[in-house]
Amino acid sequence: MIKKILGYSLALAALLVALYYGVMFGLIQVVLFISDVIMALHSLVW
């Protein structure tokens, strides 16, 4: 029983960490993409 609870908590912790890093990586990708778009628009306008 204890092992099962420990296993579940470990799996949950791993899932949370993976989710956190996935979100962070996604946010960085989005920010880079937006900055690229802004630079492209800027070069088009000027």
Swiss-Prot record:
Any matching Pfam family: DUF7396
InterPro entries: DUF7396
Protein name (Swiss-Prot/TrEMBL): Uncharacterized 5.1 kDa protein in Gp52-ac intergenic region
Organism, as annotated: Enterobacteria phage T4
Gene: y16J
